[in-house]
Design a protein with these regions (language model features):
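Short helix/loop capping segments that flank catalytic or ligand/cofactor-binding pockets
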Residues: 95-96, 130, 202-204
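Short, flexible loop/turn elements at secondary-structure junctions
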Residues: 89, 151, 197-199, 291
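Extracellular structured ligand-interaction cores
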Residues: 80-82, 188-190, 284
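Short coil/turn segments at secondary-structure boundaries
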Residues: 133-138, 187-196, 216
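Long, hydrophobic/aromatic-enriched structural stretches that serve as scaffold segments
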Residues: 56-116
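Ordered core of a single globular domain
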Residues: 172-210
Length: 309
């Protein structure tokens, strides 16, 4: 009988930070710089907002206040979450053996079976976190209010009622979002037009050549459908593929105006892999992760939300 090696491991507090970071910050929107990350929010963080009017006045010998300064705040308060999984080691052994014996296409070998298990689960958490960032609803189990929910509840956000996006109408619909953008934002270096996958695909296809969109039958730069999917622009605005957005949604904002908060160094953080072999003789492994996460925006008036009808 083969010897069973125990893989029970616990990381708590700051020691769990690396794993929590991999799980949360690997989300597409975060990893590609689409949102400002506040990594050490223990409980909540106040986002101060300063607005001014008429800063400059004619010169004079006297000091005279020339401006109205408005200072208010938004609260970024990450919520606590946990992941509890019960896994059978045998379900993962084949994959692990293939990697460790060099029969896999993967180049990065986790240093142990325990690390392999953690990496598998972390990838799933990152996918879920990406969805939560955009479409999460705190009333739903395991979610926090995402950017779309927060924008929907903010009366100052610039709303655009949309439709189902296709390659034939995508340019016109993206144009509606850019047209609704406050003039002060246009030309800012971190302004991004965040789009759902189906919108991004439709835009790439439209660039491939449709008579109605003005790029010609051979498409943009006469490349037809051989269009690059990286570094796309629309009317001078960066187009950002936000995998967490539902189909037909678009969202325009400065990346410095939207925030993701978590407490990477929080004492509440925990990553635990518990091998049940020595406890009940089974081949099960229990995985536990505890962390905090949440999002918030700053100025709603500097955001455009495109919602399908």
């Amino acid at each position: 009988m083969a010897t069973t090696t125990s893989i029970t491991t616990t990381y708590a507090g700051e020691k769990a930070a690396g794993y929590i970071s991999a799980a949360l910050l690997s989300a597409n929107t975060i990893e590609n710089g689409g949102i400002t990350v506040k990594p050490n929010v223990k409980f909540k963080q106040v986002i101060k907002r300063l607005s001014t009017t008429d800063l400059i006045a004619d010169g004079s010998c006297d000091f005279a206040a020339t401006d109205t300064v408005t200072l208010d705040e938004k609260i970024l308060q990450p919520e606590e979450f946990q992941v509890n999984l019960n896994l059978c080691k045998s379900d993962f052994r084949d994959d692990w053996d293939a990697i460790s014996m060099g029969y896999s296409a993967f180049d990065n070998l986790p240093p142990s079976f325990q690390e392999f298990l953690i990496a598998e689960i972390i990838a799933k958490i990152a996918d879920k976190n990406e969805k939560n960032i955009w479409m999460g609803a705190t009333a739903t189990f395991g979610e926090f209010d995402g950017l779309v929910a927060l924008a929907t509840a903010d009366a100052t956000v610039n709303d655009v009622v949309g439709t189902t996006i296709t390659a034939a109408n995508v340019i016109a619909e993206m144009g509606k979002v850019v047209d609704a953008m406050p003039s002060a934002l246009y030309g800012k270096s971190d302004v991004k037009l965040y789009v759902a996958q189906n919108v991004y695909k439709a835009y790439v296809r439209a660039l491939g050549g449709f008579g109605a969109n003005g790029v010609g039958a051979a498409g943009y730069e006469a490349k037809g459908n051989n269009q690059a999917i990286n570094s796309l622009l629309f009317d001078g605005v960066e187009v950002f593929l936000a995998n967490g957005l539902d189909s037909n949604y678009m969202y325009l904002a400065e990346s410095s105006n939207i925030f993701f908060g978590t407490g990477l160094l929080s004492d509440h953080n925990e990553v635990k892999v518990l091998d049940m072999a020595d406890i009940d003789g089974s081949q099960n492994v229990r995985f536990v992760m505890r962390f905090t996460a949440g999002v918030q925006h700053g100025f709603g008036s500097d955001i455009v939300l495109y919602t399908p009808a």
